[in-house]
């Protein structure tokens, strides 16, 4: 159903339900979840990478001076959804199961499992392999603005560009974060036990994430494209 969610035909009421679940499952508390992994006291170089990510997520200190949850809410205001829309919603059952898993893995006694869940799985994308094998250069302002112009919320829903700083922030800082994510997990999942735990973690995460996305699509009454 993802092509429908990012396509021109989805009504705003359905789009709102999708974003409500995204916000409560991980967007609102993502800096806190990262901090839970940092609090497991990984090696100093990993703490530095996590701290930089937390700093950006919680303050926007590397981009626009506002936390990513705040920037998300700003983007939602551009769609006509106020903050109360997200405060008063409830998680769907599958969304709650995925969120509970995120809380469990970030409290793992082995920090590398939590790092794999958040930095590799949640923040990752289909482009990760390409990014790791051939790291992209930081995008220029012109390239970022071209990306904004092509964004589905601009093209299909008429959101004003001034509300899109969350997407700008992602384009500005995410390339470096992808390198950090794989560095910390690949370099420190040294034992067979750790490697198996990481694989089990992301496999479980994928199953829960797919069930979560399917439940949102069902609640939105969407059909597979």
Segments and roles (model prediction):
Residues 177, 187-225:
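Acidic, carboxylate-rich catalytic segments that either coordinate divalent cations
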Residues 6, 10-42, 60, 113-133, ...:
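Alpha-helical bundle segments that constitute or directly flank the non-heme di-iron/ferroxidase center
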Residues 48, 55-163, 207, 217-222:
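Active-site-proximal alpha-helical scaffolds that flank and shape metal-associated catalytic sites
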Residues 162-194:
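Long amphipathic all-alpha helical oligomerization modules
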Residues 12-22, 42-64, 114-121, 162-172, ...:
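Alpha-helical scaffold segments that form or flank carboxylate-/histidine-based iron centers
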Residues 34-38, 73, 77, 151-152, ...:
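Amphipathic alpha-helical segments within well-ordered protein domains
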Residues 1-2:
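Acidic, low-complexity proline/glycine-rich segments
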